[in-house]
UniProtKB/Swiss-Prot annotation:
Signal peptide: none annotated. Ca(2+) binds at D22, D24, D26, K28, E33. Transmembrane segments: none annotated. Keywords: Calcium, Metal-binding, Repeat. The gene is CML13. InterPro entries: CALM/Myosin/TropC-like, EF-hand-dom_pair, EF_Hand_1_Ca_BS, EF_hand_dom. Residues 9-44, 80-115, 116-148 form the EF-hand domain. The keyword Electron transport does not apply. It comes from Arabidopsis thaliana (Mouse-ear cress). One of its GO terms (cellular component) is plasma membrane. CDD domains: EFh. GO terms for molecular function: calcium ion binding. This is Probable calcium-binding protein CML13.
Amino acid sequence: MGKDGLSDDQVSSMKEAFMLFDTDGDGKIAPSELGILMRSLGGNPTQAQLKSIIASENLSSPFDFNRFLDLMAKHLKTEPFDRQLRDAFKVLDKEGTGFVAVADLRHILTSIGEKLEPNEFDEWIKEVDVGSDGKIRYEDFIARMVAK
């Protein structure tokens, strides 16, 4: 386990991101870069939350990686997986019905981002009730995914 409850993988990712934002190589980043850095690590702080962090942590000058780790351990809140899934499904569910077409889901999951192989998708979709209209209720799908 890494520092302050962060996993070694998280610390490694944070170090990599920190170094990318440390453009002049002095080992420090400006408080103004905190938001974009947190977002690059999966956080989604609002401007108000960032202002609050900067004020409560007295971030008035550039800070080093150890200080950054302390900040992340205290303040980085990644979106829960179920919320990420729900947000993704809502993009497909333009009418807000709670259902998405299996064909649309197949297209996206086998052709965009970290692609699933078509046979992987077929295995996945077997675990969900598909209606006679070719649609699935995505809350059921999310519940199955989160339970695994």
